[in-house]
């Protein structure tokens, strides 16, 4: 056989498993590839096109060869339409023969007769050829292991609450179609399985929707490699998706576009985590219960059972008000015999990539977080610190009653917008206008408004401003990242913004309690006692010297002076009297020869005693 012409550049495509090959015989000798291309083009796209020639029997006088062709369509529907329309039709004077490609009978007989010889022979090429022919000639209906999910389908699927409706049928293999027709089901594509919710068929319970998340872990097979196999229940075959982990149930009203990337890109969506959820609660019941208190976008329940025989669930709401209302309504409340614990889920760094690769969920991370989001309106407890005590004095116990903790009452706490931030200590050399301030905070999320305070006349920055985010999580991340950071020559202060009146009220509530008067510490006087005595603290001021001597029994220090000083004192008085008789110019230590000589005998008398 000689190949006349290969596929044109327009229709040249790679071979696919879902391609269907048909045989076109009895073509006229004058037929060109372009004519055959125009004949089969209305029935659909075909990836391969081969026109071949075969010489007739030697007994025939005609020397014109017989032409035939093989055409490979992309789907079975196009091949069926081409066979039904062109088989037996007239084309340039010849009656066409259009049918599915099959192996010639003589090759089948050779195969059947030589099976045993091939199995027992040592010819590796024969075994390989036999395996290829055997694979080609097996039955049309595949086995369970052959029905795979198509990985190259790009069609989208729509979902109804009670059943699944396939809006655009995918292009699948003929064997898969045959299996779908035999079982009354449809083959889903990889994208459909990853995003579409497959219903769980149960008799006693309502139809819940369960999603099998896509796992990209190296140790766990992904959804694209997962088999779809039929399982029989009450003589009815359904598609069952085998998975390496437990599924998570989701409410029927969940939209298909609400994936982790969609949740992250739309900051108006809040996710509430629910702990201690009873096992008997379904997503539909939880959705109906919470929908009375706000607009619910979706509900997801993790089917892995905790140690306390409860489930973990998440609820997606559209507004911050609905989120707070649901938490105030159901937090720490008994629900179906269990105390629910609700919290606002806080995203972590690498939110999108971590959630898309997480093996336990696709809507959000279905594991309870380690820490809760701090409330923006909490006021830290300020404790009064006492000074270090004097090691020589044991203070009385009544002073410890003054050391109290100032805790503001909840009624005096003003409400603070969790999205609005106040920034001060901005360096003018780095942030000089509103645009630069917005660029500084834009990496944390979408900014609704941004203002930098400046002087009207000179437009010089005052060093503080306000930034309003669209989501509280973004504001929390900005505070945790920039507060206290050395920015230029100054250290930034980033916190929640509040009105000046509210700030005064909050500060007055903290410092409203008057502190007791400070008791002055007494001056310590260590007496000259012969025996050590225990000193006790007293509030009286030090007594005069005479009372102190009488109280403690001390003697007058003058009584202990030696008797030999009496004569010295008499000599001193005589010297003073003799000094008064001197001239006025010689008094009071005026340097004079007579004054010097008059003091010399006195000095000698004192030293000689």
UniProtKB/Swiss-Prot annotation:
Gene3D superfamilies: 3.30.70.330
Domain RRM: 20-103, 419-499
One GO CC term, this protein: nucleus
GO molecular function, one term: RNA binding
InterPro entries: Euk_RNA-bind_prot, Nucleotide-bd_a/b_plait_sf, RBD_domain_sf, RRM_dom
Keywords on record: Cytoplasm, Meiosis, Repeat, RNA-binding, Sporulation
Gene Ontology terms describing biological process: meiotic cell cycle; sporulation resulting in formation of a cellular spore
Superkingdom of source: Eukaryota
Pfam families assigned to the protein according to its UniProt record, in alphabetical order: RRM_1 (PF00076)
Record flagged with keyword Cytoplasm: yes
Localisation: Cytoplasm
UniProt cross-references to PANTHER family, sorted A to Z: OS02G0815200 PROTEIN (PTHR48025), RRM DOMAIN-CONTAINING PROTEIN (PTHR48025:SF1)
Role: Has a role in sporulation.
Protein name in UniProt: Meiotically up-regulated gene 28 protein
């Amino acid at each position: 056989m000689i190949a006349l012409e290969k596929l044109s550049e327009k229709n040249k495509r790679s071979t696919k498993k879902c391609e269907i090959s048909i045989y076109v015989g009895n073509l006229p000798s004058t037929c060109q590839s372009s004519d055959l291309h125009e004949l089969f083009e209305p029935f659909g796209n075909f990836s391969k096109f081969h026109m071949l020639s075969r010489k007739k029997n030697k007994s025939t006088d005609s020397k014109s060869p017989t032409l035939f062709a093989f055409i490979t369509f992309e789907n079975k529907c196009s091949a069926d339409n081409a066979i039904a329309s062109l088989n037996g039709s007239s084309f340039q004077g010849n009656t066409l023969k259009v049918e599915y490609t099959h192996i010639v009978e003589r090759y089948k007989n050779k195969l059947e007769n030589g099976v045993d010889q091939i199995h027992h022979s040592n010819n590796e090429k024969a075994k390989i050829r036999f395996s290829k022919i055997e694979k080609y000639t097996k039955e049309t209906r595949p086995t369970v292991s052959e029905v795979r999910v198509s990985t190259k389908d790009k069609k989208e699927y729509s979902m109804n609450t009670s059943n699944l409706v396939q809006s655009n049928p995918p292009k699948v293999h003929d064997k898969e179609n045959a299996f779908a027709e035999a079982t009354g089901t449809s083959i889903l594509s990889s994208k459909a399985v990853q995003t579409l919710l497959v219903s769980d068929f149960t008799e006693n319970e309502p139809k819940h929707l369960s999603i099998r998340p896509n796992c990209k872990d190296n140790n766990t097979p992904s959804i694209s490699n997962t088999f779809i196999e039929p399982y029989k229940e009450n003589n009815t075959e359904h598609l069952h998706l085998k998975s390496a982990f437990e599924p998570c149930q989701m409410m029927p009203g969940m939209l298909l576009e609400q994936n982790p990337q969609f949740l992250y890109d739309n900051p108006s969506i809040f996710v509430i985590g629910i702990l201690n959820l009873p096992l008997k609660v379904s997503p539909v019941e939880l959705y109906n219960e919470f929908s009375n208190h706000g607009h619910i976008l979706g509900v997801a329940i993790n089917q892995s059972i905790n140690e306390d025989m409860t489930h973990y669930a998440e609820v997606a709401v559209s507004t911050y008000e609905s989120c707070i209302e649901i938490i105030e309504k159901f937090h720490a409340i008994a629900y179906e015999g269990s105390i629910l614990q609700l919290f606002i889920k806080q995203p972590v760094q690498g939110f999108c990539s971590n959630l898309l690769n997480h093996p336990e969920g696709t809507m959000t991370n279905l594991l309870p977080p380690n820490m809760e989001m701090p409330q923006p309106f909490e006021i830290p407890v300020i404790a009064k610190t006492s000074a270090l005590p004097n090691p020589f004095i044991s203070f009385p116990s009544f002073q410890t009653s003054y050391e109290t903790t100032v805790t503001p009452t909840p009624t005096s706490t003003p409400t603070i917008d969790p999205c609005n931030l106040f920034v001060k200590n901005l360096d003018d050399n780095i942030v000089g206008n509103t645009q630069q301030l917005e660029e500084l905070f834009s990496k944390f999320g979408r900014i609704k408004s941004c203002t930098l305070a400046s002087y009207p006349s000179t437009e010089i920055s005052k060093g503080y401003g306000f930034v309003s985010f669209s989501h509280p999580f973004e504001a929390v991340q900005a505070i945790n990242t920039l507060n206290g950071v050395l920015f230029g020559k100054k250290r930034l202060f980033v916190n929640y913004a509040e009105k000046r009146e509210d700030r005064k009220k909050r500060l007055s509530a903290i410092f409203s309690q008057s502190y007791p008067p400070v008791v002055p510490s007494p001056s310590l006087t260590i007496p000259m006692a012969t025996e050590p005595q225990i000193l006790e603290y007293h509030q009286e001021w030090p007594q005069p010297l005479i009372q102190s001597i009488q109280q403690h029994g001390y003697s007058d220090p003058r009584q202990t002076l030696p008797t030999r000083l009496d004569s010295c004192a008499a000599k001193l008085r005589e010297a003073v009297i003799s000094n008064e008789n001197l001239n006025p110019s010689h008094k009071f230590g005026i340097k004079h020869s007579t004054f010097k000589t008059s003091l010399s005998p006195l000095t000698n008398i004192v030293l000689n005693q």
